[in-house]
């Protein structure tokens, strides 16, 4: 059994009726085998008083850093990410019509592997900023459904790391 004790965490509760003092309180977080066991102040002292063998507990001092649930990106086009790097894909005028034209030309020769490779880079960047839930649109105007196939494969491959919801576009 693995046990971690995260001490000195600033917990963002966001609970209705919470006072400023309650939402700013420093708490400790006890995790056993990847499951939250307890969130309370002074857990280390409590565990020691209960006779817990602290030698087997990994203690991480968060130094008052904010701890909150992961973020959700509710509108992303993972099949489009980094396509502007392809020759001829840049929307020079910045207009919607040119953007649509450039994408139409760019997607014609995209492969499942290429979309997955670029999407993985985009997902990694999202995760580094605290995002764990992503709702991505998939272009379904391609008769081969290349984008949809790529993103559905990626959803399955990354299911233990990030939650992907795929919607058609």
Question: Which residues fall in each region the model found?
Answer:
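Short, conserved beta-strand segments within well-ordered enzyme catalytic domains
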Residues: 30, 38, 59-61, 73, ...
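Generic structural signal for residues in well-ordered beta-strands
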Residues: 16, 59, 164-166
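Short, ordered loop/turn segments at secondary-structure junctions
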Residues: 42, 83, 138-139
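Active-site gating loops and adjacent loop-to-helix segments of metal-dependent hydrolytic enzymes
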Residues: 82-115
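Divalent metal-dependent hydrolysis catalytic cores, especially in the metallo-beta-lactamase
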Residues: 98-109, 118-146, 159-169
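Acidic (Asp/Glu)-rich catalytic clusters
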Residues: 151-161
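N-terminal metal-binding scaffold of metallo-dependent hydrolase/deaminase domains
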Residues: 1-52
């Amino acid at each position: 059994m693995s046990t971690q004790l995260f001490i000195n965490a600033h917990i963002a509760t966001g609970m209705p009726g919470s006072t400023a003092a309650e939402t700013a309180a420093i708490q400790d977080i006890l995790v056993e085998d990847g499951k939250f066991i307890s969130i309370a102040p002074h857990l280390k002292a409590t565990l020691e008083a209960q006779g817990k063998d602290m030698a087997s507990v990994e203690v991480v001092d968060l130094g008052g850093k904010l701890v909150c649930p992961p973020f959700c990106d509710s509108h992303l086009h993972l099949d489009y990410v980094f396509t502007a790097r392809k020759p001829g894909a840049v929307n020079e005028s910045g207009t919607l019509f040119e953007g649509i034209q450039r994408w139409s030309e760019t997607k014609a020769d995209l492969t499942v592997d290429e979309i997955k490779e670029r999407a993985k880079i985009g997902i990694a960047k999202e995760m580094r900023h605290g995002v764990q839930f992503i709702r991505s649109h998939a272009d379904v105007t391609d008769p081969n459904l290349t984008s949809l196939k790529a993103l559905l494969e990626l959803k399955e491959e990354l299911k233990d790391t990030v939650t992907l919801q795929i919607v058609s576009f």
